[in-house]
């Protein structure tokens, strides 16, 4: 009970200090207090000088020339789902976990809304909604200041609600690991001490995700459509280029990525190529909190070839020529850092957004909104 009381007292003092120092919402104040309250350095300062004193975690941001190499790398205000969007100093290891969620509903053909009743005039069944959950496990290691190695393995859970003629509803689902990605991030120009870097992303994905997912509905077993499969079934190259910029309080950047697919998988097809461009801006309110704004554009192609076990006449999701599209998302994020104490090196990040433009080779399900949250620990 004594330990619990100490923790609660420490958190209350932290919240009291933070409330006086900024104009954030009460929820954000207490989130920040929770992070600060478990750092021994802050606790010692609170005990010695009271809640009104300024802890190190509230110190104003310094010029780049006054920061250590490790602190400079920590200025990268980048969401976890910007793949390969940050690097590490030599010898540092990072473990990360990220949760991603996408909710889909309504249909588009091009930019035109299409109703389910209109789809059912051409197909015996139509999708009514879809959710994609992804749990991403990440590890990064930097053998040198210029080179960072990265590996990512997703675990997916996908559900798609369907309706048939006569108003009969059913749900398809698939779950399991997706394709493993391995990347090398190499600094081509600049350095973290200068505040500008150009980084080469050299990546490859391996077909560890299943392309043979099946469901049994109303006593009949059938192979699930292309969006319900967990992997690509092919070895894909994932090259890219990332620019990172940092100043006293600001961080910004841009990234271009591609997924280049070759050959065909064991089911006789390959997914379309993907092209992605994203840019972001972050502001360090303190050295433990930084909001961010990001815009992301993505183009993906239709399926080449076809799986003979997926009937393209049953629903639009099974048609290889109705898989491509273009979308622009606007996303806002929050980034929390632990600068001192036993949890030093920990980051907690959240980001949410929605499409501002969508053009689909449909009819296809439209994206309603996206959310991601994650935590990383570097040492």
Task: Annotate each PLM feature.
Residues 83-92, 104-108, 129, 146, ...:
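Short loop/turn motifs that connect adjacent beta-strands in outer-membrane beta-barrel proteins
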Residues 85, 97, 137-141, 151, ...:
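Residues on the lipid-exposed face of transmembrane beta-strands in outer-membrane beta-barrel proteins
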Residues 108-119, 265-379:
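Outer membrane beta-barrel transmembrane domains
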Residues 91, 131-135, 174-180, 196, ...:
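Residues that define the transmembrane beta-barrel architecture of outer-membrane proteins
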Residues 43-120, 193-199, 208-213, 226:
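Outer-membrane beta-barrel biogenesis signature
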